[in-house]
Amino acid sequence: MRYLITGGGTGGHIYPALSIARALTEQDPEAELLYVGTRTGREAAIVPQAGIAFAVISSGGVVNLGLLQRVRGGLRAARGLLEALGHIRRFRPDIVIGTGGFVAGPVLAAARLARVPLVIQEQNAFPGVTNRLAARWATAVFVPYEEARAHFPPGVRLIRAGNPVRPEIASASREAGRQALGLSERDRVLVIMGGSGGARDFNRVAAEAVLQLDVPGLRVVHITGERYFGQVKAQYGDRAPHVTLLPYAHNMPEVYAAADAGLFRAGALTLAEIQVRRLPSVLIPSPNVTHNHQEWNARTLERRGAAIVLREGGLTPADLAAALTRLLTDEALADRMRAALGEVADPDAARTIARRIVGIARQSREAREARRGR
């Protein structure tokens, strides 16, 4: 069967789509895949490296922009709709799968016009605008948290399934992770990461907090993002021999496996990964995201006792150091958080979603062939 996948702009939309794509090929060995994105989104570099055919459309955002930018974005989206219809006509998919981002809007609308079944995978507790608008057309919408249900229109078929993560996240061993990072089993390891691009204020307060920590055997792996590596390195200076500073980590499965605790933003993919790893963490949601969706994500874990959540506004290094000290030294707290994370984790999410998609696509193809046979 043929599966057309769309979603992009950020890794939070792309990597779940790739996990679903991999699961589809496992369950349908004859699967043909086409990924539709933009030339300027990160998907243009990431998807071809995954060995998936990639097609391009025009698209543009219209949310939280000025009037002129919204008009330009709308015109690009209209052109993208026509281009998406062309891709659908040529590829003839049995189903279209959207994971969000403004690129998905024209493709999902084209699927609706072409009468191709579509499904949506939402990553956040507060759904993105593209997925909320397209949900009415969808055969199914997969949501990772029950809290997301309230934000979709009545009558939408919502299916609870976690955010897909790479199998390597769950399978990486603690021993291999520590070996890769030059850490011993006796070390108490804290991993800090503010997202793939880093974050200035997050990195600044995190580094100052680390310098205030007094935890026996502490080792810190601080992933700054390329942009802020120099600033954070200067901030630590020669005061932090126990800190391993990295601009980017290409081996995140091993990094997670090596950790005893984490300090992160609250992007959907990061939260799915710490759930699968059952990694007790302090979360500082980014205040610079649409609809404040990272705080919605973080609070869903906090309510379940699965994370400590701190707001960035007004956060002092001393406050953060106190929270991290508690996380690193209170074993009873860490055990409760690991248990709570295990309850919300869904390591089989990609396979669950793919199985449903294959079933819907098969029904669609059979119905189409039955109509032709009349």
Curated annotation (Swiss-Prot):
Q: Which GO terms describe its molecular function?
A: UDP-N-acetyl-D-glucosamine:N-acetylmuramoyl-L-alanyl-D-glutamyl-meso-2,6-diaminopimelyl-D-alanyl-D-alanine-diphosphoundecaprenol 4-beta-N-acetylglucosaminlytransferase activity; undecaprenyldiphospho-muramoylpentapeptide beta-N-acetylglucosaminyltransferase activity
**Which example biological process does GO assign this protein?**
carbohydrate metabolic process
The membrane topology term of the UniProt record is:
Peripheral membrane protein
The primary site where this protein sits is membrane
Annotated residues that bind UDP-N-acetyl-alpha-D-glucosamine are located at T10, G11, G12, N124, R166, S196, Q294
GO CC, sorted alphabetically, is: plasma membrane
Cellular localization per UniProt: Cell membrane
Which chemical reaction does it catalyze?
A: di-trans,octa-cis-undecaprenyl diphospho-N-acetyl-alpha-D-muramoyl-L-alanyl-D-glutamyl-meso-2,6-diaminopimeloyl-D-alanyl-D-alanine + UDP-N-acetyl-alpha-D-glucosamine = di-trans,octa-cis-undecaprenyl diphospho-[N-acetyl-alpha-D-glucosaminyl-(1->4)]-N-acetyl-alpha-D-muramoyl-L-alanyl-D-glutamyl-meso-2,6-diaminopimeloyl-D-alanyl-D-alanine + UDP + H(+)
Keyword Glycosyltransferase recorded: yes
Q: What is the main EC category here?
A: transferase
In short, the EC number is: 2.4.1.227
Q: Which UniProt keywords apply?
A: Cell cycle, Cell division, Cell membrane, Cell shape, Cell wall biogenesis/degradation, Glycosyltransferase, Membrane, Peptidoglycan synthesis, Transferase
User: Its pathway?
Assistant: Cell wall biogenesis; peptidoglycan biosynthesis
SUPFAM superfamilies, alphabetized = UDP-Glycosyltransferase/glycogen phosphorylase
Concerning its family, UniProt says:
Belongs to the glycosyltransferase 28 family. MurG subfamily.
What HAMAP family does UniProt report for this protein, alphabetically? MurG
The record describes the protein's role as: Cell wall formation. Catalyzes the transfer of a GlcNAc subunit on undecaprenyl-pyrophosphoryl-MurNAc-pentapeptide (lipid intermediate I) to form undecaprenyl-pyrophosphoryl-MurNAc-(pentapeptide)GlcNAc (lipid intermediate II).
Record-given protein name: UDP-N-acetylglucosamine--N-acetylmuramyl-(pentapeptide) pyrophosphoryl-undecaprenol N-acetylglucosamine transferase
Q: Which organism is it from?
A: Symbiobacterium thermophilum (strain DSM 24528 / JCM 14929 / IAM 14863 / T)
Q: Which gene encodes it?
A: murG
